[in-house]
Amino acid sequence: AKLLVEYFQKQGYDLTQLQGSVNYDPMGKMMAKGKDLSNFAATAKELVDVLAPLPKYRCICVNAVELNNAGSYISQELGYALAWGNEYLNKLIEAGVPATSAAKRIKFNFGISSNYFLEIAKFRAGRMLWANIVNEYKPECECACKMIAHAETSTFNLTLFDAHVNLLRTQTETMSAALAGVNSITVTPFDKTYKTPDDFSERIARNQQLLLKEECHFNKVVDPAAGSYFIENLTVSIAKQAWDLFLNVEEEGGMLEAVKAGKVQEAVNASNKARHDAVSKRKEVLLGTNQFPNFNEKAGEKNPVEAQCCCSGNSCEKPIATLNFNRAASEFETLRLQTERSGKRPKAFMLTIGNLAMRQARAQFSCNFLACAGYEVIDNLGFPTVEEGVEAAMKAGADIVVICSSDDEYAEYAVPAFKALNGR
């Protein structure tokens, strides 16, 4: 930070007008890496003092995007972020920093999920609740109550297969954050799940938000969602849930104590598990992964890039529990990669017969279901008899034959199909 100030001075910049942040976040590192960094108050105050010549620079960061990337629910992310920010505010004030100065040095970094309207409501609720919290410290200037929020598209819902769908995810996420009035946005490159983003994917990521700014003019409006009953109602609902969580954390000793005890990590990891279960049952849809996969896509040399701990994947003792950053698609991707690299891709043949509407519906479901595991699927228009369907399956070299028909007709076709296959 000191070098930064010296550099700006040498360049002759007007220090009072420069905006940016240093993003010191010890509690975030505690949850991500498992290191005990609880004695951070002195360092935080020193940062504030060093950056005194830069009044518009933020140096303390509430990096709540880590919770989002770990699969937290929206109310959890916001509730813990408020407690997180309040902990930093308390520590700075206890270290002798005035409330106004302390609040003006804190920045929030939120994640953006694919829940479009809920994300708009989250940011609106966050600004309101943070203003209420800071106001309780009686700052000299009301401007200290303003939340500075950066938004970053989530990595939890990004996928390795059909990776270009990630562009659609991040675009709608960016749109929701822009409509919510965040101060700045980072769009995650679509290929981050399987490699270090290159010049192309980074340029596309930049252009995604430039489209919203320069062509849609989203930077020219202030709170366009105001007055919408649906979003206002969501804002109140999320604010209530987040506030209840904030109060619960404060009653138990504050965010630092909750992190040291592993309570925050335990709650977020439980949400991660619940969301993985929802994805496995298709209650939460990931297009191209657990629903409507690209039948012909192969991963090739792609391998998922997963977050590693401070020990670079080696086992180690951690004094503090850590967050689980496994993406929602990770289990499906593991299954599909194992299938693809097993040496033989199972071939599933759809024996469509009988009622036209039902056989098409059953074939579509079966193709999607099996392709999610990386199986090669062969769909068909229909067969007049079971025997013809079985012969076609044998000629195609099928490993699996799926009878696709109506419930009433299954009893009629199942026995002849079993006899025609006869262990073949």
Task: Show the residue positions of the predicted features.
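Mobile "lid/hinge" segments at catalytic clefts and subdomain interfaces of large enzymes
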Residues: 47, 52-91, 168-246, 252
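Catalytic alpha/beta active-site cores
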Residues: 1-115, 137-140, 146-150, 178, ...
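Intrinsic disorder at enzyme termini
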Residues: 183, 219, 244-346
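Short glycine/threonine-rich loop-to-helix capping motif typified by GTGT followed
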Residues: 72-78, 113-125, 154-167, 195-205, ...
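Glycine-rich anion/phosphate-binding loop at the beta-strand->alpha-helix junction
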Residues: 85, 109-197, 201-205
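C-terminal accessory/binding modules appended to enzymatic or scaffolding proteins
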Residues: 333-374
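A glycine-rich phosphate-binding loop feature that marks nucleotide/adenosyl-phosphate handling sites
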Residues: 23-27, 62-69, 104-113, 144-156, ...
